[in-house]
Amino acid sequence: MASCTETPIEAPASIAGDDDAILGELVHLARAGGGRGLLQFESLVSAHQYRDLYPLFRAYVPKGAEVLDWGAGNGHFSYFLLRSGYSVCAFALHDEGFEAWRPKGPYRFVPGTPSDPVTLPLPDASFDAVASVGVLEHVRETGGEEAASLREIVRVLRPGGLFVCWHLPNRWSWIEAIADRLPGKHHHAYRFSVSQIDALLTAAGLERVLLRRYGFLPRNLWGRSFLRGLGQRRAVARAWDALDHVLGWGFSIACQNLAFVARKPRTDAP
């Protein structure tokens, strides 16, 4: 997967074998119908859109940390968190049944209120990290607002805690630009520039420590029936990753997604 870093960091320690195993398990669950709505995992190529997220998260958030999976959806990131030794609290407006197929580990689900989609029914300073995996860009669609959601996230983070945001649509994405013009094609209604992200983080009192662009090539199309078989091959997935990385490095401004890590200050400002 393309990894277009704007704020350089030391390469994170990778646990590639574990990551590949987790992705493989999710692909198997998607194909077997064991995981509800795992559309992103209908092929190995599409599943690899998360392959860079796993080591990135581990690099910043130590094993055993208490993590809020904010907007947990079908539970795929909670699955990774549990398999990786984190203590997980999943928040979503609707329960999609992850409890029925989740791996073992410390886990609880906290439902939200559709009439009040912003408020987190959780105590202040409850978590070492909060993860948003394809969620922040959708809050307005459910009646929320990004700035208000970020204030709630800051409230439930402990001092020094981290907000890890993945799959935030890039305002200048070529994929989104084309999808926006194709009738019936899914695209994101809200996309973000770096300056917009920084303004939101500053207003919420968060300090950005990492920003990267990634994902030049499309992924989810490999889950379609005519490509699914080919997309299950590991060699094809690795080749697509390599091409994605090269094109993403050369044309980073047009990558589909943005990711960032931001920190809540360790002490309150005087």
Question: Where would I find each of the regions flagged by the language model?
Answer:
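Phosphate- and divalent-cation-binding pockets in alpha/beta enzyme and binding domains
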Residues: 76, 80, 138, 174
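S-adenosyl-L-methionine-dependent methyltransferase catalytic module, highlighting the catalytic core
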Residues: 111, 140-152, 162-266
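Short glycine-centered segments of the SAM/dcSAM-binding site in methyltransferase folds
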Residues: 66, 160-162
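Conserved N-terminal segment of class I S-adenosyl-L-methionine
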Residues: 1-123, 129-133, 150, 255-258, ...
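Alpha-helix N-cap/helix-start and coil->helix boundary motif
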Residues: 95, 136, 171-172
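A short SAM/SAH-binding and catalytic strip from SAM-dependent methyltransferases
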Residues: 129-143
